């Protein structure tokens, strides 16, 4: 969410949109079912791996999570906040202005484009006009990395993948105000969210050595993310996709085979171990 846009400075509007999106449709259409759903792994700031999922208290944030396509809940939330359609044109107003937004991603990035169409469809179902726009990447990357911008309201970027700095690096990337006001910002928080409480947590995590306290800090970070909704994940998107052709060779690595061989490239690092286990289909 671009928090330079007045309408999106309202957290009720942000959360209602996030609640209304059909994430299962995104999983099936944009991801072709190749990642966990939010029903499988409820949303947080963490990726779906066991290590990151163990870093926070799931029960403490359970009531703050949503799995999507909750049109009744989103509409009720907007109604309760007085964000209603007062002139009967089918679109809600906020502070006397029609809620009309765009949803953007680079042209040709077909999985992202499919996701943005689903976001736009969700807006229509809760009385918020959302129109998709797909600029070329050369333009897009200049706009979203600017210190401020009012061209794109809802737009897609990425988060950190799996590294030793996670999940701290991802919390920082999603919410740290240190990136605000920076021209050519490729580091994160492209929506320009600012919250001194999360900034304090981001500073505390790297120097905290007590495991219980660290879990408390991560849990509080997840709470802030789910309550304020500065951005929202559309999918668990792998950094790499893995596919094999088993017409000639078989017994490629699998996450559940107990061998713990990284599957992304059988000629890189410990991935080479996979070559020793391959079996000819017709020896």
Regions found by a protein language model. Name each.
Residues 1-3, 188:
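Well-structured core secondary-structure elements of compact alpha/beta domains
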Residues 5-13:
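Short helix-loop capping/hinge motifs at secondary-structure junctions, enriched
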Residues 18-58, 111-120, 145-283:
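Detector for C-terminal structural segments
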Residues 70-75, 118:
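Thiotemplate assembly-line natural product biosynthesis machinery
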Residues 12, 16, 139:
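Amphipathic alpha-helical recognition patches that constitute DNA-binding helices
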Residues 65-67, 83-161, 190, 211, ...:
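Ligand/substrate-recognition segments at binding pockets and active sites
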């Amino acid at each position: 969410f671009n928090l330079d846009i007045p309408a999106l400075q309202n957290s009720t509007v942000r959360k209602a949109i996030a609640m209304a999106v059909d994430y299962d449709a995104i999983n099936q259409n944009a991801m072709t079912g190749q990642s966990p759903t939010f029903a499988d792994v409820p949303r947080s700031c963490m990726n779906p791996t066991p290590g990151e999922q163990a870093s926070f208290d799931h029960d403490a944030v359970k009531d703050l999570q949503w799995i999507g396509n909750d049109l009744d809940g989103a509409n009720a939330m907007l109604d309760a906040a007085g964000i209603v359609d007062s002139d009967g044109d089918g679109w809600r107003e906020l502070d006397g202005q029609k809620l009309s937004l765009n949803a953007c991603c680079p042209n040709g990035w077909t999985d992202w484009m499919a996701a943005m169409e689903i976001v736009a469809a969700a807006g229509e179902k809760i009385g918020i006009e959302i129109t998709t726009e797909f600029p070329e990447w050369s333009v897009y990357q200049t706009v979203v990395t600017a210190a401020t911008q009012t061209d794109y309201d809802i737009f897609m970027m990425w988060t950190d993948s799996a590294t030793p700095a996670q999940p701290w690096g991802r919390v920082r990337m999603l919410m740290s105000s240190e990136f605000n006001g920076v021209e050519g910002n490729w580091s994160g928080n492209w929506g320009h969210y600012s919250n001194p409480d999360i900034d304090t947590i981001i500073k505390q995590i790297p120097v905290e050595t007590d495991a219980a306290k660290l879990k408390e800090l991560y849990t509080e970070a997840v709470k802030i993310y789910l309550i304020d909704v500065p951005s929202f994940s559309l999918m668990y998107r792998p950094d790499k996709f893995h596919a094999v052709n088993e017409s000639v060779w078989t017994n490629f690595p699998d996450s559940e085979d107990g061998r713990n061989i990284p599957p992304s490239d059988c000629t890189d690092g410990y991935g080479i171990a996979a070559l020793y286990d391959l079996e000819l289909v017709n020896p």
